[in-house]
Each structure stands twice: as C-alpha cells, then as structure tokens.
Amino acid sequence: MRSVELEVCTIEFLDQDVVHTHFKDHRSVQPDQVQAMFDVIAEDRHGRKVLLMVSVGEGTSMSNEARAYASADDSNRYIAADAIIVRDFGHQLAANVFVRHHKPGRPIQLFGDQASAMAWLDTQRHLIAS
C-alpha cells in the first residue's frame, strides 16, 4: 500500500480501485488543497477514476468553497463514488449538507465505520471502466 502525505491529508492507495483520504486534525480545507488531493490521485492512477473513502480528523472542516469544488462536475473526472466515514453527529450534519446541497454527480454514502464503507465501495467497482 502506497501513501502520500499532503499538508491537510494523507492519501492511501488501498488497491487498484480504492483510495482512502484522511483529512488531518484541526484543519480548514480549501479548494486548492482539494485539487492537490485530486492531482495526486490522477497522477498515481494515470487519469483512471477511483472509489474514494473519506475520513476526517477532529476539529477539521471544509470551507463552503472546498465542498463546492469537491462536488463540482470536474471532480467526477477523478472520483467514481465516495464513501464518507462520519465520526459524530456534527460531522454527519456537515456531510449531509455536502451531499444534499452540493449534489455531486456520483454515488455517495455515509458510514459509521471503515469496514461498512469498504463493503459498499466493493459494490461500486462496476463504475470504474477497465
């Protein structure tokens, strides 16, 4: 498993289809940092889409602009589906805003743990063209 450390997140390439991005504690994620994550994924996968599992550390949030950027049509070039691991009720509310307000054009589900998120991502592998 390969991992890449960026200023706001750690990106782990779990297998050829699944990437886990963990946003570090006490960060305010901005659009350029979301793009940096997308750039690392695109470079590693040579432009091939991935299934993305996302977890967020304590005290970390995304600016409204970063959420909008992460859900924009352009983001679908990198990500086929998202599994968001929610750590608490407040984070679940923020994740629901991301899904309902920004309406990314790809499947997104919220989960309470990594195992459930991974099981769901396994059912989404058909979204990635060989």
Where are these regions (language model features)?
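Amphipathic, Lys/Arg-enriched alpha-helical "gate/interface" segment within cytosolic domains
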Residues: M1-S130
